[in-house]
Amino acid sequence: MRFVDYVSIEVVAGKGGDGIISFRREAHVDKGGPDGGDGGWGGSIYFVGDSGMNTLLPFYQTKKIFGYNGENGRPKRQTGANGKDIFIKVPLGTQVFLKKSLICDIILEKKYLIAKGGRGGLGNFHFRNSKNKAPRISENGELGQNFYLDLQLKVMADIGLVGKPNAGKSTLLSLISNSKPKIANYEFTTLVPQLGVVKIYENSFVTADLPGLIQGASSGKGMGIIFLKHIERCRAIVHVIDFGSDNKNPIKDFIEIKSELEKFNKKLLDLNQIVIANKCDLPNFQFNLANFKRKFPKIKIIKSSLISAKQNEINIIKEKMFGLLEEKQKKLEIQEINTSKIEFNLKAPFLIKSRNNGFFEITGELIQKIIQKIPLNSQENILRFNAKVKKIGLWDELIKKGIKPGDLVRIYEFEFHWN
C-alpha cells in the first residue's frame, strides 16, 4: 500500500434541518394553534484512532468529507431526525491542523470531534406567546462546521532506527520483530517508515525503521525532512552504523546523523541513544571501534554482525533497546480538539461593496448567518429579518453610502430593491 503522510482535506458537517410553519388542523378542533416541529441536528464528523492503519492514503483519494443533514421538522410538533454522525478511521499519530495551528493529536484509539453538525431550526410552535398566538415564524437549520484541514502523520513508534543508507537498519528490524522490510545491498532500500512490534518476555514495544539519512537531510536532501518528522514521536533512538565495510568512517557518520537530528529538532538529542556497531566480522571493525570509543567514550555500543546474528545476540539487542525505554518513562501530551470553541469572527458583521450603477453587495459572516437562519417565506419572518439587520446597523450604513429607492441590494443569494 502506498505510504502517504500528508494530505489536505475539507470537512463539512451536516446542516441542521429546517423548522416549519404549521398549524394544527383536525376535525372538531377549532383554532388548533401552531404545531410546526423543529429540524433535527446535522450529523457531526469524528476521527477515530486506529492502530491497524499506517497511511493517510484514503484521504489522498477522497479530498472532501460531507456529513449527513438533519431532517426538517414536521407538523404535530414532530422534530426531524438527526443526521447520522460519521466516524472515519485514521492512523494513530495523525495530527490535524487548522490554518497551520495544531488542533488535534490523535494518539489514542478513541473518537475525536472534528466538525460539529448544525443545530436544527425552530418551528413556529416555539414562537407562540400571549401577544402572537398564531406566529408565522420559523428558522432554518444552521450550517454544519466547515473546515479546510491539513493532516500530517507521525508514526507512533517507541524507538527509531537511524543511520546512513545501507547500514543494516532493515536487517535489524526483521530480526527483532515480525516486520518483513525490503532488504537489499544498495542505498535507500527503505523508502518509507517501516514499523515492527518487538516482543521481549511479557513486554513489547514498537520500533520504526526510518529511511537512510545523509548529510543535509534536515534541509531536504535525500529522503530529507519528509521522514525526519517521524522521529519526533520516538522515546529513544538506536543508531545503526557500519563499522566494518571499506571506505566507511563510523565517527563521521555518527556526527553527521546527530547533526541532522539537532538541526531538525534539538530535543531529539535529549532522547536515550545507543549505537549498534554492525559488521563486526569484517577486518576494519576493530580499528574503527577503537577510534570510535576514544572519540565517544560515554556512548553505549553493541557489537554485532546483523546478517549472521544468533538468537542470543538478538535477545541482547532487544534487552538493551527495551532498557532505553525503562530509563525514560513515556510522556505524552494529549491535546484534544474542541471545535465548539472555533467560533465565527463577528468583529466585522458586514462589508458593503457599492458600484456606480446602483448595485450594493453585502457580505460578512454575521449577516450570512442571519440570512441563512431566517427563511424569508412569510411576512413575519421578513419583519424579523429586518429587525435583525437593523440592529447591527446595516440599513443605516447603506443610507450613509447614498443608497436610493430602486437600487439593487444583494445579500448572498437574496436580492431586493431598496424602498
From Swiss-Prot:
Function text: An essential GTPase which binds GTP, GDP and possibly (p)ppGpp with moderate affinity, with high nucleotide exchange rates and a fairly low GTP hydrolysis rate. Plays a role in control of the cell cycle, stress response, ribosome biogenesis and in those bacteria that undergo differentiation, in morphogenesis control.
Cofactor: Mg(2+)
Domain Obg: 1-156
Transmembrane region(s): none
Entry binding sites for GTP: 163-170, 188-192, 209-212, 278-281, 315-317
Top-level taxon in the UniProt lineage: Bacteria
InterPro entries named in the record: G_OBG (IPR031167), GTP-bd (IPR006073), GTP-bd_Obg/CgtA (IPR014100), GTP-bd_prot_GTP1/OBG_C_sf (IPR036346), GTP1-OBG_CS (IPR006074), GTP1_OBG_dom (IPR006169), GTP1_OBG_dom_sf (IPR036726), OBG_GTPase (IPR045086)
Source organism per UniProt: Mesomycoplasma hyopneumoniae (strain 232) (Mycoplasma hyopneumoniae)
Record domain OCT: where: 342-419
Organism lineage: Bacteria, Bacillati, Mycoplasmatota, Mycoplasmoidales, Metamycoplasmataceae
EC code(s) of this entry: 3.6.5.-
Amino acids binding Mg(2+): S170, T190
Pfam families (alphabetical): DUF1967 (PF09269), GTP1_OBG (PF01018), MMR_HSR1 (PF01926)
Keyword Metal-binding: yes
PANTHER family to which the protein is assigned, alphabetical: DEVELOPMENTALLY REGULATED GTP-BINDING PROTEIN-RELATED, MITOCHONDRIAL RIBOSOME-ASSOCIATED GTPASE 2
SUPFAM superfamilies: Obg GTP-binding protein C-terminal domain, Obg GTP-binding protein N-terminal domain, P-loop containing nucleoside triphosphate hydrolases
Protein name from the UniProt record: GTPase Obg
Residues covered by the OBG-type G domain: 157-334
Family membership: Belongs to the TRAFAC class OBG-HflX-like GTPase superfamily. OBG GTPase family.
Designated gene of the protein: obg
Record-level Gene Ontology MF annotations: GTP binding; GTPase activity; magnesium ion binding
Subunit architecture: Monomer.
Keywords, ordered alphabetically: Cytoplasm, GTP-binding, Hydrolase, Magnesium, Metal-binding, Nucleotide-binding
